[in-house]
């Protein structure tokens, strides 16, 4: 006689049933992260499409910003709230709009709506990568890498305006609007001379260079395992053998530079590290701008340029350009301040 000793199956509650449904194998995986990702991404994208299509920026920036007013894809935008709104969350039912949807749009409520839902959507997408990596049984480096774009978005769209007087000084959601924000950062913060911006540029362009070099090197060293014009069809995702020669690639770059990667794992970690560090460092720099921190003020050159009409450097020329950006941008960018700059205070280079 056989006696089976076992544990009675635990009763399945609503959490287990929901967990099974969320993690069911389907074309688009949902998961627990999807409860955050899909609603927030849908609302952020919908708010942006609504704003760029219908909503004016006349009451916040004194400009047209929608397709309805004649803008195109490059010039339409969801503009930041009015300067007078400060750092209000601009809830539809809050004291500013008092439930009036049209008034809420006029005050810039859609920008706050898109920015906050967009931030949570990006966080949800990173959590999605964590969740699927855990289910598949791989390490979560994709999610860690995606923290770079999240850091940039949060620092630029949320932390920077929080350090300034209001949401008004954040970037509006549009192509030309982002360009205006870049000019603003240069004119008011001398952003291109900031070392964190330099590290960010080095990281992003360095990552692009590494990507191009890596792709070209792999294509160069593919094994000739087919008779067709290209070898793409000769590859099978489940094949055991290598599809390109790391030894040949190492030999090639050793001859080019005298040094080359000999370890695929170190090579690919480096390709991950360079662009992500670029994104992180540029985010740190933006946080510095939020606090109005200065970087690289070469005062001695400015003093000498002021005293000697024949002395000028690229730095002093850029400082004059920044003064021009501030003097010409501020009246157009902040019409509510009624700035008026007389001719004698506008910047003039030494050559003039």
UniProtKB/Swiss-Prot annotation:
Binding-site list for chlorophyll a PD2: 197
Cofactor remark from the record: The D1/D2 heterodimer binds P680, chlorophylls that are the primary electron donor of PSII, and subsequent electron acceptors. It shares a non-heme iron and each subunit binds pheophytin, quinone, additional chlorophylls, carotenoids and lipids. There is also a Cl(-1) ion associated with D1 and D2, which is required for oxygen evolution. The PSII complex binds additional chlorophylls, carotenoids and specific lipids.
EC number(s) recorded for this UniProt protein: 1.10.3.9
Positions that bind pheophytin a: 129, 142
First-tier enzyme category under EC: oxidoreductase
Residues the record lists as binding a plastoquinone: 214, 261
UniProt key word Transport: yes
Entry keyword set: Chlorophyll, Chromophore, Electron transport, Iron, Magnesium, Membrane, Metal-binding, Organellar chromatophore, Oxidoreductase, Photosynthesis, Photosystem II, Plastid, Thylakoid, Transmembrane, Transmembrane helix, Transport
TM regions (residue ranges): 40-60, 124-140, 152-165, 207-227, 278-294
Known catalytic reactions: 2 a plastoquinone + 4 hnu + 2 H2O = 2 a plastoquinol + O2
Gene Ontology molecular functions: chlorophyll binding; electron transporter, transferring electrons within the cyclic electron transport pathway of photosynthesis activity; iron ion binding; oxidoreductase activity
Pfam families listed in its UniProt record: Photo_RC
Miscellaneous information on this protein: 2 of the reaction center chlorophylls (ChlD1 and ChlD2) are entirely coordinated by water.
Function: Photosystem II (PSII) is a light-driven water:plastoquinone oxidoreductase that uses light energy to abstract electrons from H(2)O, generating O(2) and a proton gradient subsequently used for ATP formation. It consists of a core antenna complex that captures photons, and an electron transfer chain that converts photonic excitation into a charge separation. The D1/D2 (PsbA/PsbD) reaction center heterodimer binds P680, the primary electron donor of PSII as well as several subsequent electron acceptors. D2 is needed for assembly of a stable PSII complex.
Name of the molecule in the record: Photosystem II D2 protein
């Amino acid at each position: 006689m056989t006696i089976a000793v076992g544990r009675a199956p635990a009763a399945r509650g609503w959490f287990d049933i929901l967990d099974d449904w969320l993690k069911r194998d389907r074309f688009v995986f949902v998961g627990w992260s999807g409860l955050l990702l899909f609603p927030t991404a849908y609302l952020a994208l919908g708010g942006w499409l609504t704003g760029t299509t219908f909503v004016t920026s006349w009451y916040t920036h004194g400009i047209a910003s929608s397709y309805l007013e004649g803008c195109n894809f490059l010039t339409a935008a969801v503009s930041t709230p009015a300067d007078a709104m400060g750092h209000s969350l601009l809830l539809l039912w809050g004291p500013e709009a008092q439930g009036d949807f049209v008034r809420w749009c006029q005050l810039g409520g859609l920008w706050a709506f898109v920015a906050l839902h967009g931030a949570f959507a990006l966080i949800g997408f990173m959590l999605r990568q964590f969740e699927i990596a855990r289910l598949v049984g791989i390490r979560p480096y994709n999610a860690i890498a995606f923290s770079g774009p999240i850091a940039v978005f949060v620092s630029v769209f949320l932390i920077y305006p929080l350090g300034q007087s209001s949401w008004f000084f954040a970037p509006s959601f549009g192509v030309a609007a982002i360009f205006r924000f870049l000019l603003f950062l240069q004119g008011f913060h001398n952003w291109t001379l900031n070392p964190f911006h330099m590290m960010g540029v080095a990281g992003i362009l360095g990552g692009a260079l590494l990507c191009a070099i890596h792709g070209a090197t792999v294509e160069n060293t593919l094994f000739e395992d087919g008779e067709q014009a290209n070898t793409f069809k000769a590859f099978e995702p489940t094949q055991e053998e290598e599809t390109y020669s790391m030894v040949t690639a190492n030999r090639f770059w050793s001859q080019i530079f005298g040094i080359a990667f000999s370890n695929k794992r170190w090579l690919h970690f480096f390709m991950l590290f360079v662009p992500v560090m670029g994104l992180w460092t540029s985010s740190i720099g933006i946080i510095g701008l939020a606090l109005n921190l200065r970087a690289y003020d070469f005062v001695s050159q400015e003093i000498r340029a002021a005293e000697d009409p024949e002395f000028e450097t690229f730095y002093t020329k850029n400082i004059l350009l920044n003064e021009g950006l501030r003097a010409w941008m501020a009246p157009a960018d902040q019409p509510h301040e009624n700035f008026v700059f007389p001719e004698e205070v506008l910047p003039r280079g030494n050559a003039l």
